């Protein structure tokens, strides 16, 4: 999939919608290829201005979508046109997980604390009982050399990384080449 991208602040943002993310997921899983997806919101824009490591990490992510209404306003003010439709992942996460369930894809959750992860997974299982959750890891004190091995052995198709910015983007950019998954997606704090 080729998506138009626009330069806004110190990074590029792809003009993608939820339907593009689902199409990209289907494509990469069917072709057994890998893709990374992240987002840019006003908080990340502020961080980029003083964090070159984050800027470099964002440049390594295949697709960055605009997150939140603030990015739409910024594009209108700075670029003088409605260039971006924001894709707020919290509006689509349940729909995406149901999409994964329907296709029998396996998902791995990386991020947050053990307590929050267990509560999140229990809630997801109560609403989407047939979703194949292939594993989870604490994103704060369980990240070590074995983490990649655990994720890879889970046979997950999709990895959701919810560690907040800039940690999740930097972790993804440093580890994407070692991951045996099809879709790696930064989803914010869990």
Description of each model-found segment:
Residues 121, 169-178:
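Short Gly/Thr/Asp-enriched flexible loops that form oxyanion-binding sites at enzyme active sites
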Residues 151, 155-165, 181:
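Proline-aspartate-enriched helix->loop->beta-strand connector
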Residues 37-39, 65, 158-162, 185:
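Structural motif
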Residues 139-143, 181-190:
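Short, flexible loop segments at boundaries between secondary-structure elements
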Residues 62, 107, 134, 157, ...:
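Conserved acidic residues
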Residues 41-45, 163-168, 190:
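Short glycine-rich anion-binding loops that position phosphate/pyrophosphate groups of nucleotides
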């Amino acid at each position: 999939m080729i998506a138009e991208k626009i330069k806004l602040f110190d990074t590029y943002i792809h003009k993608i919608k939820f339907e593009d993310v689902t199409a990209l997921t289907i494509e990469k899983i069917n072709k057994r290829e890998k893709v990374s997806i992240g987002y840019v919101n006003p908080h990340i824009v502020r961080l980029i201005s003083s964090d070159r490591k984050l800027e470099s990490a964002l440049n390594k992510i295949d697709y960055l979508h605009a997150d939140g209404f603030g990015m739409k306003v910024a594009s209108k003010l700075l670029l003088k046109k409605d260039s971006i439709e924001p894709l707020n992942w919290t509006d689509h996460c349940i729909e995406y997980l149901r999409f994964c369930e329907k296709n029998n894809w396996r998902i791995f959750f990386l991020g947050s604390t053990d307590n929050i992860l267990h509560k999140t997974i229990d809630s997801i299982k109560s609403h989407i009982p047939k979703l194949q959750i292939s594993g989870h890891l604490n994103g704060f004190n369980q990240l070590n050399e074995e983490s990649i091995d655990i994720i890879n052995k889970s046979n997950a198709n999709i990895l959701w990384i919810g560690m907040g910015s800039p940690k999740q983007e930097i972790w993804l950019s440093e580890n994407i080449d070692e991951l045996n998954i099809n879709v790696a997606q930064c989803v914010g704090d869990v």
